[in-house]
């Protein structure tokens, strides 16, 4: 090892030694600056490299997304996937290179600066200190007078000790300098050599990777050449076709006038028509119309679900309209509404009218089940019947209201005469009927029975689930409880007079209902059969403020679902397994224990039985209470004059509310606090119930004793869904008032949004649970 500073000169402490030290110290200082700069540049390079890797990964993800987008093109998908995988390997190689760079350059050089240079600086400080002490000792020794022997000896001793210490520290300092000068060469070369080997490994790995990819790239290049040739050929063909088409006469749309009743895809005719809106402005909008499956439907965009104009063409007529200013207009009239349409020309108008008339005639000739009809709210796109959507395919394959209702026990035959395959229903009773019995039910009046067709009418989701929750077996156990005891035989199909007498005795006179005695007045019964804890729990609902009540409902987790579909307590039947309500499945233990205090329903007043059963979501018991004469609007004076409908809201069941409303419940009847069902549903965050009550005419302007209407409660609770529904209903109400007595029932936007909320509340209630889930977080 070549010495930078000589040890002999060190002992002499000569000017040559001091000059050598000064030179070495300056060199070390400059070395430290260079190394610090190199380390900082290395760190910046590594950070930039990591950022490059991150950006490169994002670029690779973009290539993969493009490959997935090109899934229909095997060549593009395969090549992009293969290239992205190879480039991902290169990113991994880059990551390894940066890690090795960090270890070889940054870590090693930083360690050299922090360890070796620090030792040098420490030795320098000690040397400078002892040098200063030596100089002081020499000066003091020179200044001592001869006649002061004691001071002479003391100065001599200090000088001797200081010189010895100086020589020792100076030798250590010189050794540290020489070692540092030697080590810096090895450290710098070692780190740079490691760095170069890292690059060698990086490029070698990249070479191996692309050597394997090379043959595929050559094949792809040859294939690309063929694709370019094919593309040029296709371009020439399209240019020729374009030139040929340009020579045709497009002055008329005769090519679009054809319709085919026997079309393979079921579409008789389709094309653009102008449709007059039902809003206040009576605007005309251009929509894509089609006639298919004996229905007239339209849509705005291809991805939109078609809106059904006419459910069944057999129930409508079509006629020319010459009494309005716009040309080429015709009107499609059904029993419930009419639709004004406008074609682009007289030929197109005649073609559409003829297509509708032909479809009507064809519909009358056809036989069989109508299960392939489009559903008004979730029918598949007219142009995408093969889109692969399972739920839409199910509807096309026959999962209709008829099938879903008839699969309930007892519903496969008429509830009153036993005739098979009934296609009518009484929606407030929850039973299926044959066509003859349905006519008799109509004659009873809607206060006894509301009749609807299972095949021709539109079924709202909550009403369909109500039908699935009851059924002929459940209702007959109530209304035919004493038929066998009384020795009465049910009428047979075809016996019109016997049927009429039997049905009137069954539902109007209720002769066959099992009568039970009522020995207690309603207040006495409540005091006897309702525990104090139960009353406190029930009444505590009304003591909360809007915010507290929402949090309480979220904590109890008993009302976290608005669907209202629950298991019947009689037979445990789950009406619609895909949308079982969490209300009936997760009821708190305390409330179940209190509900057991109600004991046998035979000991309850019918009104109180209906009241309790509404909270328990027990539809069979509710039907039994109504059969025994319960007032559907009975108010419980012991519990704030709450009604069965309010109890159904507190119980969290949408179907229970629907059942009470179908049987005449007053949607605006309020308790002593001035809160109606809409208030309670808003406070609890039950979006599905709010939607149902607004559709049934609930007064959202009514205020409670605190002066709050449902909208202000929803705004305070920050429930966006309910605020949207209330404001939309209020806007629709104002629009109807502005149109006067003969205005339309509401614009299409209002109807579409409420239809969507009804669908979600019944079929996807978890989508409306956002408010409860957010409340649980707090």
Curated annotation (Swiss-Prot):
Role of this protein: GTPase-activating protein (GAP) for ADP ribosylation factor 6 (ARF6). Doesn't show GAP activity for RAB35.
GO cellular component: endosome membrane; membrane; plasma membrane; ruffle
Comp. bias regions, Polar residues: 379-388, 552-569
Effect in UniProt of substituting residue 731 to A: Strong decrease in interaction with RAB35
Impact noted for substituting residue 442 to Q: Loss of GAP activity
UniProt-recorded name of the protein: Arf-GAP with coiled-coil, ANK repeat and PH domain-containing protein 2
Highest taxon listed in the record's lineage: Eukaryota
C4-type zinc finger span: 414-437
Activity regulation statement: GAP activity stimulated by phosphatidylinositol 4,5-bisphosphate (PIP2) and phosphatidic acid.
Modified residues (Phosphoserine): 384, 387, 521, 581, 584, 775
InterPro entries noted in UniProt: ACAP1/2/3-like, AH/BAR_dom_sf, Ankyrin_rpt, Ankyrin_rpt-contain_sf, ARFGAP/RecO, ArfGAP_dom, ArfGAP_dom_sf, BAR_dom
């Amino acid at each position: 090892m070549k010495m930078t500073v000589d040890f002999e000169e060190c002992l002499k402490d000569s000017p040559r030694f001091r000059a050598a030290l000064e030179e070495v110290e300056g060199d070390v200082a400059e070395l430290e600056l260079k190394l610090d700069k190199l380390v900082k540049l290395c760190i910046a390079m590594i950070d930039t490299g990591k950022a490059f890797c991150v950006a490169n990964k994002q670029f690779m993800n973009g290539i993969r997304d493009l490959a997935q987008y090109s899934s229909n093109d095997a060549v593009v998908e395969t090549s992009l996937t293969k290239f992205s995988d190879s480039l991902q390997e290169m990113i991994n190689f880059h990551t390894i290179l940066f890690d090795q760079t960090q270890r070889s350059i940054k870590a090693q050089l930083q360690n050299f600066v922090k360890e070796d240079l620090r030792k040098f600086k420490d030795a320098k400080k000690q040397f400078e200190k002892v040098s200063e002490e030596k100089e002081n000792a020499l000066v003091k020794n020179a200044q001592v007078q001869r006649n002061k022997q004691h001071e002479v000896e003391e100065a001599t001793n200090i000088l001797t000790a200081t010189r010895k210490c100086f020589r020792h520290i100076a030798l250590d300092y010189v050794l540290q300098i020489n070692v540092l000068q030697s080590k810096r060469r090895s450290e710098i070369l070692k780190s740079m050599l490691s760095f170069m080997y890292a690059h060698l490994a990086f490029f070698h790995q990249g070479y191996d990777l692309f050597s394997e990819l090379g043959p595929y790239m050559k094949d792809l290049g040859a294939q690309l050449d063929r694709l370019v040739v094919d593309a040029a050929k296709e371009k020439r063909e399209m240019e020729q076709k374009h030139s040929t088409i340009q020579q045709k006469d497009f002055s008329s749309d005769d090519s679009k006038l054809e319709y085919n009743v026997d079309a393979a895809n079921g579409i008789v005719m389709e094309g653009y028509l102008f449709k007059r809106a039902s809003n206040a402005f009576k605007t005309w909008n251009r929509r894509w119309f089609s006639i298919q499956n004996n229905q007239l439907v339209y849509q705005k965009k291809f991805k939109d679900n078609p809106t059904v104009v006419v459910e069944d063409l057999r129930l409508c007529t079509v006629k020319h309209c010459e009494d309005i200013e716009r040309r080429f207009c015709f009107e499609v009239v059904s029993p419930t509404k009419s639709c004004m349409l406008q074609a682009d020309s007289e030929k197109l108008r005649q073609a559409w009218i003829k297509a509708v008339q032909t479809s009507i005639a064809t519909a009358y000739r056809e036989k069989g089940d109508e299960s392939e009809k489009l559903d008004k709210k979730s029918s598949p796109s007219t142009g995408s019947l093969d889109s692969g959507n399972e739920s839409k395919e199910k509807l096309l394959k026959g999962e209709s209201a008829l099938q879903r209702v008839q699969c309930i026990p007892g519903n496969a035959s008429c509830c009153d005469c036993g005739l098979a395959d009934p296609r009518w229903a009484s929606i407030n009773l929850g039973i299926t009927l044959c066509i003859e019995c349905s006519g008799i039910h109509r004659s009873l009046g809607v206060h006894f029975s509301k009749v609807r067709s299972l095949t021709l009418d539109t079924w709202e989701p909550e009403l369909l689930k109500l039908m699935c929750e009851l059924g002929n077996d459940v209702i007959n156990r109530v209304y035919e409880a004493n038929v066998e005891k009384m020795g009465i035989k049910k009428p047979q199909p075809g016996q019109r007079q016997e049927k009429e007498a039997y049905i009137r005795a069954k539902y109007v006179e209720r002769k066959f209902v099992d009568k039970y005695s009522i020995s207690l007045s309603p207040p006495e019964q409540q005091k006897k059969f309702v525990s104090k804890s139960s009353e406190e729990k029930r009444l505590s609902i009304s003591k909360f403020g809007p915010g507290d009540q929402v949090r309480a409902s979220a904590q109890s987790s008993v009302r976290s679902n608005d669907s209202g579909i629950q298991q019947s307590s009689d037979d445990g039947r789950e009406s619609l397994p895909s949308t079982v309500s969490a209300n009936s499945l997760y009821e708190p233990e305390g409330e179940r224990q209190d509900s057991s205090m109600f004991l046998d329903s035979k000991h309850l007043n019918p009104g109180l039985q209906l009241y309790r059963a509404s909270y328990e979501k027990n539809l069979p018991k509710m039907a039994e209470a109504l059969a025994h004469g319960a007032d559907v609007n009975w108010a419980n004076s012991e519990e704030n004059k709450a009604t069965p409908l309010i109890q159904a809201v507190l119980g969290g069941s949408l179907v229970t509310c629907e059942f009470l409303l179908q049987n005449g419940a007053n949607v605006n009847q309020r308790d002593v606090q001035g809160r109606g069902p809409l208030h309670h549903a808003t406070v609890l965050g039950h979006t599905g119930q709010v939607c149902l009550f607004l559709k049934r005419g609930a007064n959202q302007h009514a205020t409670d004793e605190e002066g709050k209407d449902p909208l202000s409660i929803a705004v305070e609770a920050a429930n966006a869904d309910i605020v949207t529904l209330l404001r939309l209903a209020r806007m629709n109400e104002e629009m109807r008032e502005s149109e006067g007595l003969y205005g339309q029932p509401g614009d299409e936007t209002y109807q579409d949004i409420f239809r969507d909320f009804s669908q979600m509340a019944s079929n996807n209630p978890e989508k409306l649970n956002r408010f409860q889930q957010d409340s649980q977080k707090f």
